[in-house]
Amino acid sequence: LMDFERDEGKILACCATAQSDIVIEADIEEDPDAQYLPLDDFQGVVERVAALTPTIRGIWLRPDKPMRFQAGQYVLVQVPGVTGPRAFSIASAPGDALIELHVRKVEGGQATSWLHEKLKVRDRQDFRGPFARFFVRKSANRKALFIAGGSGLSSPQSMLLDLLAEGADYPIVLFHGARNRAELYHAELFLELTDRHPNFTYVPVLSGGDDPDWIGATGHVHEQLKSYGEGDFRGSKAYLCGPPPMIESCIATLMQGRLFERDIHTERFFTAADAGTPARRSPLFKTI
């Protein structure tokens, strides 16, 4: 801080320690769709595990008590022998008996390696939640675009399952990007949903172009996004979940298609490789 800022009573809240009881006032933007649910500690019994892809494992936990969460939120999982919890988005819909998690194995990652190699059915797993403000703005009642990369599918899956279960009748589109067909998962689930819900469209996209039997979309997700609706995204709400490079490319495409910050909601997936890069808003967004 500069001396004049100290004289004005300003502090750096990120490194200040309260010495007594205090009252904090803050300007917080209220969202009519936000549910302020209490955090709680849970212990779940592992009901099922499955290799969704060669690098992504599905884990289904039965919590020891009902868990309330908004579709799109995540939990913190405490892994034995690993310092600090790890965050995993919930893939199941609110109200489901089981909590579904998608865990991508990170090279050299102690936590994800343990969850892939050691965790087994009937084990007990501690977790805490729910966290995050990544949720569907249902009050908007307009076209929803879900854009996911890899295991970033978890939050969008929960969100669209929730919307369809509630009878949303506006267009809902899911773009899911994967490197190859082996890394694409839950395709059968989404194809079944397209049969049951005429307003739902599923667009799987493979970035690897070496599969001669693949007749679906290829390239990067943002490239396929450009061709959707002739590149005009006005009147939509977009929800993006995945690695930061994919998020930034898709934000640029959406904004070029006249969809702006207030209608674009993101959740970035970081790994140990991203540790040196602080989490931040998209440089394309003006609001701090």
Segment roles from a protein language model:
Residues L1-I22, P171-I288:
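Reductase modules of NAD(P)H-dependent flavoproteins
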Residues I11-A34, D123, F127:
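Short, structured interface segments
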Residues A34-R124, N141-R142, A178-N180, V205-G209:
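Ferredoxin-reductase
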Residues G72, G152, P243:
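Short, conserved phosphate/pyrophosphate- and ester-handling motifs at nucleotide-, phospho-/glycolipid
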Residues G129-A140:
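A short, basic/flexible loop-to-alpha-helix module at the beginning of a structural domain
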Residues L145-I147, Y239:
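Conserved beta-strand elements of the Class I
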Residues S155-A165:
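Histidine-anchored nucleotide/phosphate-binding helix
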